[in-house]
Regions:
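Transmembrane alpha-helices of Major Facilitator/SLC transporters
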Residues: 3-33, 46-54
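Transmembrane alpha-helical cores of Major Facilitator Superfamily
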Residues: 12, 16, 48, 80, ...
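Cytoplasmic loop-to-transmembrane helix junctions
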Residues: 38, 45, 70, 74-77, ...
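C-terminal ends and interior cores of transmembrane alpha-helices
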Residues: 45-67
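Hydrophobic core of transmembrane alpha-helices in multi-pass small-molecule transporters
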Residues: 66-88
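Intracellular juxtamembrane helix-capping segments at the cytosolic ends
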Residues: 87-102
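A late C-terminal transmembrane helix in Major Facilitator Superfamily
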Residues: 98-132
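Symmetry-related core transmembrane helices of the 12-TM Major Facilitator Superfamily/SLC fold
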Residues: 137-159
Length: 172
């Protein structure tokens, strides 16, 4: 359309998506009730969705030249996938932390969960050092595949993880 949209304009998307998708995913768990997946499966699914974000971002770099202007919908869908993954992982992680912790240490375990997210963000800042102009496809592909593989491992071993956490006897 010949319009230019600043990068800063997209900074509100994750917050808007988080509010909307948090409500949608929370409603999904309410509707599913006792049929909902175990917490590790939710985290595995969410992690795979996180990985789908970078995998999706390989597409515009494969379809268009690096100097080409592309639709802003690419970044919108990228954010949508990332935040949908977060809607699966974040609340479930906080719930698990409070469920598996001894009652006297629930707050500390919730803090440890928060610190794990900070650690992930710190690792991301290290991963950015591997980015070189012109290497967008391999960069996003590696990050996406590693993240999806981690989610798949959590899904495969979900029941064992839940049993190890003592969550097969407890409900979320």
């Amino acid at each position: 359309f010949g319009m230019e949209i600043s990068a800063a304009s997209f900074q509100t998307l994750p917050a808007v998506f988080a509010i909307f998708l948090g409500a949608v995913v929370g409603s999904l768990w309410s509707v599913l009730g006792k049929r909902q997946p175990l917490a590790p499966a939710k985290i595995g699914i969410g992690t795979i969705l996180w990985g789908c974000g970078p995998l999706f971002m390989t597409l515009p770099f494969m379809l268009y030249g690096a100097a080409d202007k592309v639709s802003p919908l690419w970044i919108v869908v990228f954010y949508l996938l990332i935040i949908l993954g977060e809607a699966f992982t974040s609340p479930v992680g906080y719930s698990c932390a409070s469920i598996v912790a001894p009652q006297a240490f629930a707050t500390q375990m919730i803090t440890v969960w928060s610190m794990s997210q900070s650690t992930g963000a710190a690792l991301n800042t290290l991963a950015v050092n591997f980015y070189k102009e012109g290497s967008e496809v391999p960069f996003f592909l590696v990050i996406g595949l590693i993240t999806c593989a981690a989610g798949l491992i959590v899904l495969i071993f979900g029941k064992k993880i839940a049993a190890g956490m003592g969550m097969l006897e407890k409900t979320e």
